[in-house]
């Protein structure tokens, strides 16, 4: 076995170049952001939340039979470590091995922005951001489709399934999905009754694994041959934050041959899912228990779209897809031979240069995380084309009508196109992400003064900002809900709260210079007065003298939060005395190497600290120290020397990129802060 250490987070297409092959060899590549991930049979994967125009699995197998260059079909999103294991009893001479990068890959000290201090830990912390924005920002054209369209149908390699947007818009229920499939290797997979996200009834049909084509590392316990396997959730195996129930297995008394066409149908009926193979019923799968969690899944066990995608290293062709209603009417037909299929199933090639939340996961354009990205990119790579590309990408999906008119999706998937915006209405969740997106635009303008680049988007930006103003509660003056959306969800804190109100005041202030530069003085005045009114409301309604800081919200006056303190300071609502008092109050949130998010949170060994909101706090501490000469040194050092230092001080878990959510830890023990998915939202912050 060979173990490769790339030294820091990298992303791209894995490749190997050989100069001598004694006979056909099978090589297993395994990837991990941390070294310890390589000890796991499936690495630090799979990633089953989104397709991401990348490999969902962190293990892939290569069959090398000739000398020369071999490259993976899939992008591996982000990793520092890689192992290479020879599976066959033969030999191979390797000339080179590595990743064909999908983005910029420059040493941190050679970037346009780089910080050097007398403290090596701080230097390494700052470098985390420069690393992440290089691997998480992807150039247009560098993320091709994960499907291939042929004259026989869609050639689909094993990955998280991709769902039909047409099926979502049809609101199909109690239907029969039928299709033709040819297994090239291992198996073929499909869904029915699914959300646009890959969650819902999932079926996998395995082949007979012929000796001349099967990989030696196929897990035949998880994937027995000639078997129909079913799971009702995300995948066949657990992913760290997406647990799944146990699989159901239906062994077949027939041989499922590879390189032969098979006809499959799955019918959603009252007593379960009826599955036929070549006209013979092979299983009746009982309906899963009803679920109250409709955040991503279909609202009914009988309703939802369909999708396709098999498991690790499997390949199949899917064609002649047909959906028939319970009354026998055909409601959908697709030979799967047109390039339009890629758009419908959300796997079209990337057509914008954009920044994702992270290279490995979620590989979505999260507009809330975008704010962090702007700040970090400004201090490191200065690749402004990624920022304007992300702005254009998000705004192209802007909602025109309805209660959320003006909003944009909070987590646009790679591979989608605006014509299917309504199939994935993520704008209904975490409404304060709209504010963070607007704040990111304001910061971009502050850094660049790019009037020309933003002018064509000004009407859309203004429309979103005006839409958010309607979410100010007229009775409290705080940010809450609108008449059409009275109870929205937020990320930073509850409605009528210090965090969401402070953020929106901050956002309004940032947009004033942009409005003035666009010659829109009336709008600039409105934004300015809105920000002023929000600051007054925070102090009038949420400053709690007995608590000596800002209350979490009107509904929870006895609690306070890290984000409420941060945004009260960043918005300018807090004066010097209020800021000093709030900083002292942080000691009550202190936990391990960081701070709890909310005062009422219970401490436990599984509590996950949050670098994302802690980044807002760190910035607030720096700014308040400069503006009001507050004594914020202890709190600042606690974050730098604890939370962020834990990302760089243990080489077994350090990837050279920032973490999303380390668990409670002290930063010194062997197990300290070892859990952390690298995402762009988690950067070191500050100018």
What spans do the regions from the language model cover?
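Glycine-rich, flexible loop segments associated with nucleotide phosphate handling
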Residues: 47-54, 302, 425-427, 602-607, ...
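Active-site core of glycosidic bond-cleaving carbohydrate-active enzymes
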Residues: 198-202, 366-422, 433-438, 442-687
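Second-shell loop/turn segments in exported
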Residues: 111-119, 360-363, 374-379, 494
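Internal amphipathic alpha-helical repeat/solenoid segments
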Residues: 355-359, 422-426
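Extracellular/oxidizing-compartment recognition motifs
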Residues: 1-357, 405-409
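Short, charged/polar micro-motifs that form catalytic or ligand-binding hotspots
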Residues: 6, 72, 360-363, 377-381, ...
């Amino acid at each position: 076995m060979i173990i490769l250490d790339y030294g820091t987070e990298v992303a791209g297409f894995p490749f190997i170049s050989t100069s001598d092959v004694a006979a056909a060899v099978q090589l297993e590549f395994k990837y991990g952001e941390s070294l310890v991930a390589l000890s796991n049979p499936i690495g630090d994967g799979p990633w089953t939340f989104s397709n991401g125009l990348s490999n969902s699995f962190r293990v892939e197998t290569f069959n090398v039979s000739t000398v020369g260059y071999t490259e993976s079909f899939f992008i591996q999103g982000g990793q520092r470590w890689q192992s290479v294991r020879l599976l066959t009893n033969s030999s191979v001479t390797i000339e080179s091995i590595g990743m064909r990068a999908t983005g910029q890959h420059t040493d941190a000290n050679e970037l346009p922005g780089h910080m050097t201090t007398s403290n090596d830990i701080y230097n390494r912390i700052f470098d985390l951001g420069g690393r992440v924005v290089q691997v998480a920002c992807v150039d247009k054209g560098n993320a091709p489709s994960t499907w291939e369209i042929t004259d026989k149908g869609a050639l689909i390699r094993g990955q998280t399934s991709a769902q039909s947007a047409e099926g979502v818009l049809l609101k199909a229920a109690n239907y029969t999905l039928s299709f033709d499939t040819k297994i090239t290797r291992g198996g073929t997979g499909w869904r029915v009754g699914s959300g646009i996200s890959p969650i819902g009834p999932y079926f996998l049909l395995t082949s007979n694994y012929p000796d001349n084509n099967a990989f030696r590392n196929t897990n035949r316990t998880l994937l027995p041959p000639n078997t129909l396997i079913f799971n009702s959730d995300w995948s066949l195996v657990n992913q760290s934050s997406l647990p799944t129930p146990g699989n159901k297995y239906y062994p077949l008394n027939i041989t499922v041959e590879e390189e032969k066409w098979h006809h499959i149908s799955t019918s959603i009926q009252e007593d379960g899912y009826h599955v036929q193979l070549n006209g013979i019923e092979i299983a009746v799968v009982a309906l899963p228990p009803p679920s109250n969690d409709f955040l991503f899944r279909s609202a009914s066990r009988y309703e939802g779209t369909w999708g396709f995608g098999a498991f690790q290293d499997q390949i199949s062709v899917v064609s002649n897809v047909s959906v028939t209603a319970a009354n026998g009417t055909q409601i959908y037909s697709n030979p799967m031979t047109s390039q339009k299929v890629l758009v419908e199933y959300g796997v079209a090639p990337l057509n914008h240069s954009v920044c994702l939340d992270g290279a490995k996961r979620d590989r979505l354009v999260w507009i809330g995380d975008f704010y962090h990205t702007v700040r970090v990119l400004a201090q490191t790579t200065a690749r402004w084309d990624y920022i304007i590309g992300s702005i254009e990408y998000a705004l192209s999906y802007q909602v025109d009508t309805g209660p959320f008119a003006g909003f944009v999706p909070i987590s646009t998937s790679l591979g989608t196109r605006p014509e299917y915006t309504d199939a994935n209405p993520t704008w209904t969740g975490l409404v304060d992400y709209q504010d963070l997106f607007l704040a990111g635009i304001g910061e971009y303008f502050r850094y660049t003064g790019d009037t020309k680049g933003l002018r064509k988007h000004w009407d859309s930006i203004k429309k979103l900002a005006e839409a958010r103003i309607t979410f100010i509660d007229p009775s409290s003056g705080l940010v809450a809900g609108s008449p059409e959306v009275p109870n929205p969800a937020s990320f930073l804190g509850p409605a009528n709260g210090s965090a969401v109100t402070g953020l929106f005041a901050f956002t309004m202030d940032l947009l004033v210079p942009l409005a003035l530069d666009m010659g829109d003085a009336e709008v600039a005045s409105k934004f300015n007065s809105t920000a002023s009114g929000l600051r007054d409301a925070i102090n009038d309604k949420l400053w709690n003298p007995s608590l000596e800081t800002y209350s979490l919200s009107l509904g929870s006056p006895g609690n306070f939060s890290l984000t409420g303190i941060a945004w009260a300071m960043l918005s300018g609502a807090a004066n010097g005395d209020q800021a000093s008092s709030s900083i002292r109050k942080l000691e009550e949130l202190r936990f391990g190497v960081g701070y709890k998010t909310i005062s009422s949170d219970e401490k436990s060994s599984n509590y996950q600290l949050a670098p994302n909101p802690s980044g807002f706090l760190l910035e607030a501490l720096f700014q308040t120290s400069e503006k009001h000469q507050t004594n914020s040194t202890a709190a600042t050092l606690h974050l730098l020397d604890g939370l962020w230092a834990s990302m760089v001080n243990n080489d077994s878990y350090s990837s050279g990129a920032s973490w999303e959510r380390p668990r409670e830890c002290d930063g010194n023990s062997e197990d300290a802060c070892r859990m952390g998915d690298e995402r762009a939202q988690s950067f070191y912050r500050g100018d």
